[in-house]
Amino acid sequence: MFGLKNFFKAAIFLSLLGGLTLYIIRQIQYQSDIMPFEQYNPPSTLIVEENPITKAKYPFIDVHNHQFDMPLKDLSKLTAEMDSLNMAFMVNLSGFRGLYLKECLDNVKENAPNRFGLFVNLDWEEIDSPDFMENNLAILRKAKEDGAIGLKVYKGLGLTDVDSNGKRISIDDERLDPIWEACGELGFPVLIHSAEPASFWLPKDKNNERWLELKQKPIRYRDPKKIPSFESILAEQHHIFKKHPNTTFINAHLGWMGNDLTRLGNHLDSYPNVMTEIGAVLAELGRQPRSARQFFIDYQDRILFGKDSYNVAEYYTYFRVLETKDEYFNYYRKRHAFWKMYGLDLPDTVLRKLYYKNALRILPSIDSSLLPID
């Protein structure tokens, strides 16, 4: 017989079951309204003037580019793309060394003799070898003789490169001093990429502005328990700038200080032998148009145009940020910038210096006939 006690038990059970069912239904409904952050990219409803640009206002020199197949590359196709952008000259930082570098230079000399420059690259991990310095100074001299125009230092130095004992090689290791000095003597600018965005050292959580990039590219995370801090790596880099005032350094990617232009300005004030460039950090500039515009005006003799990874369509965003007054438009890669861009509307005098004049000053072997005569 179904008694009162059992009735209450059944009522409680059904009530709990109903509540659980309602909870599950609501969770399903809630989850159905959730999308991954990567997918959320609604078209803007803002109606403002738009001035997309596919060709730079002035011929420009790209001082930060990578072409990894230069010995065999069809340069006629590449130069046609460059012409479409108004790119007068490209610096390929991935020249490597030895026979590879020679084959790169031979291809350029035969097929596009005045459109490309090659930077040589060195291997730091042989630093303990007795003939390390002799070999590397010989590489630099031979590269200069063959037609290379500078030295590119990759981020491995200071981050991941180690000596024969497994010890990290610091950027300011005194054993490398003769190389920096030799570059000054040879007239080789040193484009050096040190560290990464500071956010790569921070916890991968909701407070990290680079969370999406670290999610999509987890290898970029820098564990502070295993890797020297962002600030210590920058300090090593800045130390060589101070120690070698007769060598011209190009601090790549705005020295990862594009989010703090006051600091970057102080940095340039401290080291007159240092230039900087904007490769892969346009997103920092496009979100602070007033500050960035003033920075470009104040330091117009110290900034070079660079792009880094080569993609024709991505240059369009660079031109639009640098040349227009456009508001609230997309950057081309969400993991670098989930925010919108604003144009800096740089003055023509500043644009000319950014696009080609500053590069010509530190890379005088570039054929100036490719560029306007002011």
Label for each model-derived stretch:
Residues 101-220:
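Active-site gating/metal-coordination segments in enzymes
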Residues 67-75, 92-102, 125-134, 161, ...:
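Acidic-and-aromatic substrate-binding clefts and catalytic sites of carbohydrate-active enzymes
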Residues 52-54, 78-84, 103-116, 138-148, ...:
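Acidic (Asp/Glu)-rich catalytic clusters
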Residues 33-39, 57, 162, 198-225, ...:
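Active-site gating loops and adjacent loop-to-helix segments of metal-dependent hydrolytic enzymes
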Residues 1-17:
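N-terminal Sec-pathway targeting helices
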Residues 24-114, 358:
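An N-terminally biased module of ancient metal coordination in phosphate/nucleic-acid-related enzymes
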Residues 71-72, 79, 225, 230-374:
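H/E-rich (His + Asp/Glu) clusters that bind or coordinate divalent metals
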Residues 61-65, 89-92, 116-121, 151-153, ...:
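Hydrophobic faces of well-ordered beta-strands that scaffold small-molecule active sites
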